[in-house]
Amino acid sequence: MKHDPQFRALTPKWHQGYRFQYEPAQKAHVVLYPEGMIKLNDSAALIGGLIDGKRTITAIIHELQQQFPNVPELGMDVDEFMEGTKKKNWIDLV
């Protein structure tokens, strides 16, 4: 699935009340929210760590492609993460 440039031009930011951080007790990155905590896998943590309310989806993909140049599906993975977290209201896309 490929997205048009308009989708990738959006800037993700964590939804109000949601916070991304490393949780030593879980030995993992998590998303904290008022009702609890979501433990992220390594891929989601890499993407989530780049959500700062300033970078566009395109910029996040570019940053990850610099770190992982031999992962051709990386853009699709980021798109799916953004779509999924938006549907769950973890992030806002502006």
Curated annotation (Swiss-Prot):
InterPro entries from the entry?
PQQD, PqqD_bac, PqqD_sf
The answer to keyword rRNA processing applying to this record is: no
Q: Which UniProt keywords apply?
A: PQQ biosynthesis
Q: Name one GO biological process term.
A: pyrroloquinoline quinone biosynthetic process
Highest taxon listed in the record's lineage: Bacteria
Pfam families with a match to the protein in the record: PqqD
Q: In which pathway does it act?
A: Cofactor biosynthesis; pyrroloquinoline quinone biosynthesis
GO terms of molecular function: quinone binding
**Described function:** Functions as a PqqA binding protein and presents PqqA to PqqE, in the pyrroloquinoline quinone (PQQ) biosynthetic pathway.
State the family named in the UniProt similarity comment for this chain: Belongs to the PqqD family.
Q: Describe its partners and assembly state.
A: Monomer. Interacts with PqqE.
Family annotation (NCBIfam families): PQQ_PqqD, PRK02079.1
Q: Which HAMAP family match?
A: PQQ_syn_PqqD
**Identification of the protein by name:** PqqA binding protein
- Gene giving rise to this polypeptide: pqqD
